[in-house]
Amino acid sequence: GAMSNLEIALVADGVKASGAQAGGDLLYRKMEGAGIDRALNKIKALCTDPNGGCVFWNAGAQPPELLANGEVVMATGWNGRFFNAQMEGTPLVQVWDAQILDYEYFAMVKGGPNDANGEALKVLREMTSSEGLAGSAKYIAYAPWRKSSIAVMEAGEPWYKDGKTNMVPHMPTNPTNLKSHILMNPDYWADNQ
């Protein structure tokens, strides 16, 4: 879909990703008015370039597969899928410049099961604690949002479940990987789907 492809196209056309860190202000302002046309024109130019072309994917496993079989020389995709391919021996290198950070939300339904007895809140607190968020990164390369979780991981490296792999370098929220990024703006996309 358009989400993330338009952001990537604007960066490819010269808009600085680093201006998009605070909720996407600069980048998302550029998408107003002629910005959408600018992004679409960049996508068209990339897709019709005689030295390039585009393959659009619709399943998370496709980008590393396309790279591994030589059908494409670069791809966008989810870092966890690229990490898994690397762990399976595929010679891939992730580039973090202008990465797009998106996040998920936890929600508790008022009046739902375990609301009255406090169990739901207890679980939510544990899941979002520094240790709880870091714990999930033992199994998948999707990053915790808390800086304190990265510190927990650094102190416990090698962090990955195999007991050999340092995970912090593979985290999108590792400070080294955050030098130039786009923070997905859910408000923009809620208003412009």
Name each model-derived stretch.
Residues 170-193:
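Conserved C-terminal helix/tail region of periplasmic/extracytoplasmic solute-binding proteins
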Residues 1-62:
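Extracytoplasmic ligand-binding site segments that recognize negatively charged/polar headgroups
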Residues 6-10, 40-44, 64, 76, ...:
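Non-transmembrane alpha-helical segments in soluble domains
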Residues 109-178:
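Mature extracytoplasmic/periplasmic domains
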Residues 3, 33-37, 58-61, 114-118, ...:
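Soluble non-cytosolic domains of exported or imported proteins
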Residues 19, 76, 94, 136, ...:
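A generic structural-conservation signal
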Residues 10-17, 46-51, 71, 79, ...:
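Sec/Tat-exported extracytoplasmic proteins
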Residues 48-113, 150-159:
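Extracytoplasmic/periplasmic substrate-binding proteins
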